[in-house]
A protein has these predicted regions:
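RNA/tRNA-interacting regions in translation and RNA-turnover enzymes
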Residues: 1-251
């Protein structure tokens, strides 16, 4: 029974990522939940539990928006200078936290005030975010060093660090809705801007460069993302090495 259900889910998931969804999100989530109840150790969950933390590409904005319609909605977020962390929850319980290099930080991350140990979600959900030192927003290298020191030390204080969640890994919502859903679950999300036209990007880039945008964070750039999950999946299909629907700007 579980193997047949697992095959169905993998088939639906494959078609979704190819841009041809066969069922809606609610139906898919129910199938995942049923599989988890029947067989929580299914290979499907093992494959999904590989928490990817790829570095963002640093291409030219012209290349990023090439081929997009002028009214394609974009999201601008701060590129927080800290350490990337991926969280995994099963039936609302935080079960795993890893660093970009794959280190298991679960027990340490549970000490961070901004990371809820329990959330109201059934089944599997994986979340990406940044661990950083917010009080040092004018000293970016210090923020990253503080986060890295916390991860390395056997026993270190966590009260000076924060966690900002900005992505549901392998999620099905657009970026704006993903951020709002993360907020609803109790996570701190980054300040962000929605662009209704691709030509608005330069205005926000200049604001950040002139220290008039995202000043509440230790930033070393800004991140531009496609809002549409459908467009994100199209770009993922042609480039699996990193999420080409998100790009870091560091100038």
């Amino acid at each position: 029974m579980s193997s047949y259900l697992e095959e169905r889910i993998e088939w639906y998931d494959h078609n979704y990522r190819m841009g041809t969804p066969l069922i809606n999100d609610d139906q898919f989530d129910k199938l995942e939940a049923n599989l988890f109840r029947v067989n929580p150790n299914a290979n499907y969950f093992s494959k999904k539990s590989i928490l990817p933390l790829p570095s963002l590409p640093k291409d030219r904005i012209e290349e990023f928006i090439e081929g997009l319609l002028p009214d394609t909605r974009l999201i601008i977020e701060p590129k927080i200078d800290g350490c990337a962390i991926a969280l995994q929850y099963i039936d609302g319980e935080l079960v795993k936290a890893i660093s970009r290099k794959g280190g298991d930080l679960t027990n340490k991350i549970k000490k961070i005030p901004d990371v809820p140990n329990k959330i109201k979600v059934q089944g599997l959900i994986q979340i990406r975010g940044e661990l950083y030192a917010p009080a040092e927003h004018d000293r970016t290298s210090y923020s990253q060093r503080q986060a890295a020191a916390f991860m390395r030390a056997a026993d270190s204080k966590s009260d000076h660090l924060s966690f900002c969640a900005f992505q549901i890994i392998n999620g099905r919502l657009n970026q704006h809705d993903s951020l709002q859903y993360l907020r609803k679950l109790g996570f701190t999300i980054p300040e962000y801007r929605s662009l209704n036209f691709t030509t608005q990007f330069e205005m926000y880039r200049k604001q950040w460069s002139n220290k008039k945008l995202f000043n509440n964070y230790p930033t070393d750039g800004i991140v531009v993302k496609l809002n549409s999950r459908k467009l994100q999946l199209i770009r993922e299909k042609f480039n699996e090495s990193y999420p080409h629907w998100a790009m870091a700007i560091k100038y």
